[in-house]
Protein backbone atom coordinates (compact mmCIF):
# COMPACT_ATOMS: atom_id res chain seq x y z
CA UNK A 1 0.00 0.00 0.00
CA UNK A 2 2.89 2.35 0.77
CA UNK A 3 4.30 1.93 -2.72
CA UNK A 4 0.89 2.42 -4.32
CA UNK A 5 0.43 5.71 -2.47
CA UNK A 6 3.95 6.86 -3.35
CA UNK A 7 3.31 6.13 -7.03
CA UNK A 8 -0.07 7.86 -6.86
CA UNK A 9 1.52 11.00 -5.48
CA UNK A 10 4.30 10.88 -8.08
CA UNK A 11 2.30 10.72 -11.28
CA UNK A 12 -1.38 10.30 -10.47
CA UNK A 13 -1.02 6.54 -10.57
CA UNK A 14 -2.86 4.16 -10.68
CA UNK A 15 -4.79 5.02 -13.78
CA UNK A 16 -7.00 1.97 -13.33
CA UNK A 17 -8.88 0.87 -10.27
CA UNK A 18 -7.42 -2.63 -10.59
CA UNK A 19 -4.08 -1.79 -8.95
CA UNK A 20 -5.77 0.12 -6.14
CA UNK A 21 -8.27 -2.65 -5.43
CA UNK A 22 -5.55 -5.32 -5.47
CA UNK A 23 -3.38 -3.29 -3.10
CA UNK A 24 -6.32 -2.76 -0.76
CA UNK A 25 -7.12 -6.47 -0.75
CA UNK A 26 -3.47 -7.32 -0.08
CA UNK A 27 -3.32 -4.82 2.78
CA UNK A 28 -6.52 -6.21 4.28
CA UNK A 29 -5.19 -9.76 3.96
CA UNK A 30 -2.01 -8.60 5.68
CA UNK A 31 -3.95 -7.37 8.69
CA UNK A 32 -4.32 -3.65 7.94
CA UNK A 33 -7.89 -2.63 8.72
CA UNK A 34 -9.38 0.78 7.92
CA UNK A 35 -12.82 1.82 6.64
CA UNK A 36 -11.29 3.22 3.44
CA UNK A 37 -9.47 -0.04 2.71
CA UNK A 38 -12.67 -2.03 3.12
CA UNK A 39 -14.52 0.26 0.71
CA UNK A 40 -11.65 0.17 -1.78
CA UNK A 41 -11.31 -3.61 -1.54
CA UNK A 42 -14.83 -4.23 -2.84
CA UNK A 43 -14.76 -1.92 -5.87
CA UNK A 44 -15.15 -3.32 -9.35
CA UNK A 45 -12.40 -2.79 -11.92
CA UNK A 46 -14.34 -0.04 -13.68
CA UNK A 47 -14.77 2.31 -10.73
CA UNK A 48 -11.67 4.40 -11.37
CA UNK A 49 -12.98 7.72 -10.06
CA UNK A 50 -14.18 6.13 -6.85
CA UNK A 51 -10.82 4.42 -6.38
CA UNK A 52 -9.02 7.78 -6.57
CA UNK A 53 -11.31 9.26 -3.90
CA UNK A 54 -10.89 6.23 -1.66
CA UNK A 55 -7.11 6.22 -2.11
CA UNK A 56 -7.05 9.78 -0.80
CA UNK A 57 -9.04 8.62 2.25
CA UNK A 58 -6.77 5.62 2.78
CA UNK A 59 -3.72 7.88 2.55
CA UNK A 60 -5.12 10.05 5.35
CA UNK A 61 -6.04 7.00 7.45
CA UNK A 62 -2.62 5.40 7.09
CA UNK A 63 -0.45 8.52 7.02
CA UNK A 64 0.92 8.09 10.57
CA UNK A 65 1.65 4.39 10.04
CA UNK A 66 3.18 4.53 6.55
CA UNK A 67 5.45 7.52 7.23
CA UNK A 68 5.23 8.69 3.62
CA UNK A 69 7.93 11.18 2.63
CA UNK A 70 6.79 14.78 2.63
CA UNK A 71 9.24 16.07 0.00
CA UNK A 72 9.51 15.28 -3.69
CA UNK A 73 13.13 14.19 -3.19
CA UNK A 74 12.12 11.85 -0.36
CA UNK A 75 9.34 10.35 -2.46
CA UNK A 76 11.65 9.87 -5.45
CA UNK A 77 14.28 8.16 -3.30
CA UNK A 78 11.67 5.83 -1.81
CA UNK A 79 10.43 4.94 -5.30
CA UNK A 80 14.02 4.44 -6.46
CA UNK A 81 14.53 1.93 -3.62
CA UNK A 82 11.48 -0.03 -4.76
CA UNK A 83 12.60 0.12 -8.39
CA UNK A 84 16.14 -1.06 -7.62
CA UNK A 85 14.87 -3.89 -5.44
CA UNK A 86 12.61 -4.96 -8.30
CA UNK A 87 15.62 -4.92 -10.62
CA UNK A 88 17.70 -7.06 -8.25
CA UNK A 89 14.79 -9.48 -7.75
CA UNK A 90 14.38 -9.86 -11.53
CA UNK A 91 10.92 -8.26 -11.63
CA UNK A 92 12.01 -5.28 -13.72
CA UNK A 93 13.87 -5.06 -17.02
CA UNK A 94 17.34 -3.49 -16.66
CA UNK A 95 16.68 -0.77 -19.25
CA UNK A 96 13.32 0.11 -17.70
CA UNK A 97 14.87 0.29 -14.24
CA UNK A 98 17.77 2.48 -15.38
CA UNK A 99 15.43 4.82 -17.24
CA UNK A 100 13.06 5.14 -14.29
CA UNK A 101 15.82 5.73 -11.73
CA UNK A 102 18.19 7.74 -13.92
CA UNK A 103 15.68 10.03 -15.57
CA UNK A 104 12.28 10.01 -13.85
CA UNK A 105 13.53 9.87 -10.25
CA UNK A 106 16.96 11.52 -10.46
CA UNK A 107 16.81 15.29 -10.00
CA UNK A 108 18.13 17.11 -13.08
CA UNK A 109 19.71 19.90 -11.06
CA UNK A 110 21.69 17.72 -8.61
CA UNK A 111 24.98 16.52 -10.09
CA UNK A 112 25.79 14.76 -6.80
CA UNK A 113 22.62 12.67 -6.72
CA UNK A 114 23.31 9.00 -5.96
CA UNK A 115 20.88 8.22 -8.81
CA UNK A 116 22.92 9.98 -11.52
CA UNK A 117 25.14 6.93 -12.30
CA UNK A 118 22.03 5.14 -13.58
CA UNK A 119 21.65 7.81 -16.24
CA UNK A 120 25.27 7.27 -17.33
CA UNK A 121 24.72 3.50 -17.41
CA UNK A 122 21.64 3.97 -19.59
CA UNK A 123 23.58 6.09 -22.10
CA UNK A 124 26.20 3.33 -22.38
CA UNK A 125 23.52 0.65 -22.68
CA UNK A 126 21.71 2.53 -25.44
CA UNK A 127 25.00 3.01 -27.28
CA UNK A 128 25.80 -0.69 -26.93
CA UNK A 129 22.37 -1.66 -28.22
CA UNK A 130 22.72 0.64 -31.19
CA UNK A 131 26.25 -0.43 -32.14
CA UNK A 132 26.76 -3.77 -30.45
CA UNK A 133 23.51 -5.60 -31.07
CA UNK A 134 22.16 -5.70 -27.53
CA UNK A 135 23.01 -5.62 -23.87
CA UNK A 136 25.88 -7.78 -22.74
CA UNK A 137 25.71 -9.82 -19.57
CA UNK A 138 28.63 -7.78 -18.24
CA UNK A 139 26.77 -4.50 -18.63
CA UNK A 140 23.66 -5.91 -16.95
CA UNK A 141 25.84 -7.27 -14.12
CA UNK A 142 27.37 -3.80 -13.77
CA UNK A 143 23.88 -2.30 -13.38
CA UNK A 144 22.96 -4.88 -10.75
CA UNK A 145 26.18 -4.16 -8.85
CA UNK A 146 25.45 -0.43 -9.01
CA UNK A 147 21.91 -1.02 -7.73
CA UNK A 148 23.16 -3.13 -4.82
CA UNK A 149 25.82 -0.53 -3.97
CA UNK A 150 23.34 2.37 -3.99
CA UNK A 151 20.79 0.41 -1.95
CA UNK A 152 23.43 -0.48 0.63
CA UNK A 153 24.81 3.06 0.75
CA UNK A 154 23.02 6.31 -0.08
CA UNK A 155 19.52 4.83 -0.29
CA UNK A 156 19.75 2.58 2.77
Protein language model features and the residues they cover:
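Acidic, Ser/Pro/Thr-rich low-complexity regulatory regions
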Residues: 1-156
Amino acid sequence: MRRLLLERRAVGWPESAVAAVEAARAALAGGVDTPGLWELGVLSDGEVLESHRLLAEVEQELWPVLRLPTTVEGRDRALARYCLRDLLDGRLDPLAAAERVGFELCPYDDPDSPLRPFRAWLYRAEDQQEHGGGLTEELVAELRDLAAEVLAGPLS
